[in-house]
């Protein structure tokens, strides 16, 4: 079965091309590229970790929807935070998106792109 690229490449801040697919389906698995708190205009959501976590999770939900998936289909999540002091605030907001139980997850500290406080990628399982 061929790999299906879902969505179109986006433009980031300053009109910079972002050369990756938002999602890729490989068989029954859907891989969502790392999402940050990027608004439609390519700018990062202003504000702290609360606003950026919500925007990032909403972006994940939107890309999942383009692939015919929901958060219920997510099997694994990888999270990068630029400041570990934000963990508990992030965690509370993150948990609200998974009221029926959260998927497997890893969370690490990482230097992220300018102004981004969080990045999230996911792997979903959704049989064709």
Predicted features by range, described:
Residues 1-58, 62-75, 81-128:
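N-terminal presequence-like segments and the immediate start of the first folded domain
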């Amino acid at each position: 079965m061929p790999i299906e690229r879902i969505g179109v490449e986006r433009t980031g801040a300053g009109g910079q091309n972002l050369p990756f697919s938002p999602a890729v389906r490989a068989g029954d698995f859907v891989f969502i590229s790392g999402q940050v708190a990027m608004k439609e205009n390519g700018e990062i959501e202003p504000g702290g970790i609360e606003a950026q976590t919500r925007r990032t999770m909403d972006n994940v939900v939107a890309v999942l929807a383009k692939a015919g998936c929901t958060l219920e289909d997510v099997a694994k999540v990888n999270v990068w935070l630029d400041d570990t002091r934000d963990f508990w605030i992030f965690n509370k907001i993150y948990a609200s998106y998974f009221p029926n139980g959260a998927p497997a997850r890893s969370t690490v500290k990482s230097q992220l792109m300018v102004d981004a406080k969080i990045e999230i990628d996911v792997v979903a399982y959704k049989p064709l």
